[in-house]
Regions:
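A short acidic, Gly/Pro-enriched loop at the edge of an enzyme's catalytic core
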Residues: 106-107, 169-184
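Conserved class I S-adenosyl-L-methionine
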Residues: 108-117
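Conserved SAM-binding loop of SAM-dependent methyltransferases across substrates and taxa
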Residues: 118-131
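Helix-to-beta-strand junctions that scaffold the AdoMet/dcAdoMet cofactor pocket
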Residues: 129-130, 226-228
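Class I S-adenosyl-L-methionine
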Residues: 178, 231-234, 239-363, 368
Length: 468
């Protein structure tokens, strides 16, 4: 990309970055002459990274950090390959991939992603939890929360609850509850300038200050939900010190029970820059801790740039834990329909404990999830299916959380054959075998359900996901 074709960057932003970066500024500016890096992260719940690399028909270049991450050419259209529909990988900016592994949740822990849409970091957290423990993924935006639900479903996350609440309401219900909390805060999006016309067009100094004010309140709510001894990751995709070091500094000034944590440094990790806060009134102790934060830059590594600060909540006396959700017993008819489906169509059914109905939808609720009554939620757990008149119909979420060994009937399609696209378009195709529900797979990886009747497989791939 030539300088003449460089995206039109706001001049006030460039002047500020030149003042802050000094000798680094020419390299930073030159990064806008380069195409954006496209990242791909393997779904380790389903496939080993190297196995994915060997299977795909296009080249993947491994990144040194984080694990399971690759560089991929946009020209290959990786989002159109059937393996993407099977949830074998997520397309994500490499900088954004650093947040979840720095938070480093362990299997069995309780984890919150407070502003989770569209799901890049939430799916990463799900992989690290290995379907053990609890993941609460929250998104207040009424449309974006469905993108989040779709991506976690495709990922095969079986231990996730998806809520659509304000941070303040969640904080009232989950005090001192989570082992780890991720807040990828809404921001001015300066790290999106190379990719997004809208981000460049909407940027203004007033936007930066407005975001910083909003972030302070959201971070306070996030902190209230972290247990003593727990770890919080605060991140943004902006370079503005007011939203990065400034938000963390203001938080530390009013939260004496939190301290910054120094992460293990990887190639391309630059320190926080508290000196950019200028005359903002920040205590010396808070300023000293800000250098432990991580800044990722488009001129020093792959990706568009990110800010990450890890904050540990100090230990204190033991507190009373929240009780798990006391689920009502399923109606007899619902139990019968579900058990009939499992007996006729599955070899290994999901565990029958912690089953719950939300309307006509049947879920398996993650262990340890407190009562969500009164909160807005999309899914309170793994969506198994829907109770309809006289029967149980399996969900897309159930299909994506199973393996071929779990079901009685499988229709396996070749990723290079036209039949897989026929299925993804929602069309029927010839398929010999016993009648009934069939798990449709691509090269052995689940894509969704089909129903076979007299040698014809009717696609039950969800209408909203179908190829056009």
């Amino acid at each position: 990309m030539s300088e003449q074709s460089r995206p039109l960057i706001p001049q006030a932003f460039l002047a500020r970055m030149e003042r802050w970066l000094g000798d680094e500024y020419p390299a930073f500016l030159a990064s806008y002459d380069q195409p954006a890096t496209n990242g791909l992260r393997a779904n380790t719940l389903k496939i080993a990274p190297e196995a994915l690399r060997e299977r795909l028909p296009f080249a993947l270049e491994p990144l040194t950090w984080p694990p399971a991450a690759f560089r991929v050419s946009e020209e290959e259209q990786p989002g159109r390959h059937p393996y993407h529909a099977a949830g074998l990988y997520y397309l994500q900016d490499p900088s954004a991939m650093s947040v979840a592994p720095l938070l480093a949740p362990q299997p069995g822990e309780r984890v919150l992603d407070l502003a989770a849409a569209p799901g890049g970091k939430a799916t990463h957290l799900a992989s690290l939890l290995a379907n053990q423990g609890l993941l609460v993924a929250n998104e207040i935006h009424p449309r974006r929360v469905w993108d989040l639900a779709e991506n976690l479903e495709r990922w095969g996350a079986r231990n996730a609850a998806i809520t659509a609440e304000t941070p303040e309401r969640l904080a009232e219900r989950f005090p001192d509850f989570f082992d780890r909390v991720l807040l990828d805060a809404p921001c001015s999006g300066e790290g999106m300038f190379r990719k997004s016309d809208a981000a460049r067009r909407e940027w203004a100094a007033e936007l930066v200050l407005g975001c910083a004010n909003r972030q302070t309140g959201i971070l306070d709510a996030a902190a209230r939900m972290l247990r003593p001894g727990g770890l919080l990751a605060y991140s943004t995709c902006t370079f503005a010190a007011e939203e990065d070091e400034g938000t963390v500094a203001r938080f530390l000034e009013t939260h004496a029970d939190f301290e910054p944590v120094e992460p293990a440094r990887q190639a391309g990790f630059a320190p926080g820059r508290p000196e950019w806060l200028g005359n903002e009134k920040v205590g010396e102790a808070a300023r000293d801790g800000l250098g432990r934060a991580v800044r990722l830059w488009p001129h020093t590594g792959p990706g568009e740039g990110h800010f990450i600060a890890l904050l540990r909540r100090c230990e204190r006396e033991a507190h009373e834990d929240l009780p798990g959700w006391r689920l009502p017993k399923l109606p007899v008819e619902a139990t019968r329909f579900y058990e009939t489906f499992c007996r006729e169509h599955l070899q290994r059914a999901p565990a029958t404990e912690r089953l719950a109905l939300a309307g006509s939808y049947l879920y398996q609720v993650p262990a340890g999830l407190p009562d969500l009554g009164g909160l807005r939620f999309i899914h309170p757990g793994w969506w198994l299916g829907t109770l309809k008149k006289g029967r149980f119909e399996p969900s897309q979420g159930l299909a994506m959380g199973l393996s071929p060994a779990d079901v009685r009937r499988v229709a396996n399609l070749d990723s290079a054959a036209p039949q897989v696209l026929t299925y993804l378009r929602g069309e029927s195709l010839p398929n010999a075998g016993a009648d009934g529900w069939v798990l449709v797979t691509v090269d052995g990886f689940p894509l969704g359900w089909g129903k076979r009747v007299q040698g014809t497989l009717k696609s039950h791939y969800p209408r909203g996901l179908r190829r056009v």
